């Protein structure tokens, strides 16, 4: 069996060497010649997998180590009898950690009290749903917009218009859909962005085209009160340099790039391939994950809640480092800038998740316990 894989997928040998030969290619440069002889194709979101890539090949299984599937032509897969699998939820926790770190940074700059803000989460799937649970667990006010879930479940969902009108913070976690009943391409365009509340914070860690980047650039030029955090960009790896400069935080599509999340994505695709082939799983992720460099943190029961929240979250992840690295990489030379974007992702340093952290509390601290539990860390 021949497996063709994106060279940046972690743990390829550990999970897949038992199936046969593995050939690695840069994800953005995979072409029909690269995959013609492959039986299995493993990709990330940077590879468009469609008829043009696969027609005439031997590929019968496509695995993407990502939550999103907008880079896969699922209609063609069905027509050609190609089995496929994604990795739902693999990096959800990493994205939540990114959002929390961004909120702390914005609060420092704005002087805003996080518990007193109203949060709007647009898209409540694997990532957005987990963020909603964390924010609710903190006791913060959250409005949720997800028309697909609303249609299926009913429940306490609101419209996008309500989010725009009532929320101080808007965090986007939708898939990218250009058609259908609920398209998300330019979900926030000029008209929607104009309705942002005074002093609003906008976070996009979903897909770049969910926000009209040109309209956002014009808004930020006109309104200094609005803070934008962008991890995803229209046309990436090409980036609108002026928009990046106007953003309060700007990063190169790494919100979900925790070590745990990336390796979890590989594990999920491995499990799917085992099911497809009818083979038993011989490798377990828990045997491959290294121990985190920080395993436990301790607080006094009298610790200030805001300080404890910032200390706990930033002990695991602080987006300001990624923002600084990204800004240093930006270049007026388009080719250099695209290469730097991909290099930052390829060489991204190991980053762990807050759920792997144990917290010891000295004395009675019910509010701290609630906060730690909401974040997903473990009180010991």
UniProtKB/Swiss-Prot annotation:
Q: Would you tell me the protein name for this molecule?
A: Erythronate-4-phosphate dehydrogenase
Q: Which residues bind substrate?
A: 45, 66, 257
In which compartments does the protein localize? Cytoplasm
Q: Name one GO molecular function term.
A: 4-phosphoerythronate dehydrogenase activity
Known PANTHER family for this protein? FORMATE DEHYDROGENASE 1 (PTHR42938:SF9)
Please provide, in alphabetical order, the Gene Ontology terms of the cellular component aspect for this entry.
Answer: cytosol
An example GO BP is: pyridoxine biosynthetic process
Q: Please give the superkingdom of this protein's source.
A: Bacteria
User: What is the species of this protein?
Assistant: Pseudomonas putida (strain W619)
Catalytic activity annotation:
4-phospho-D-erythronate + NAD(+) = (R)-3-hydroxy-2-oxo-4-phosphooxybutanoate + NADH + H(+)
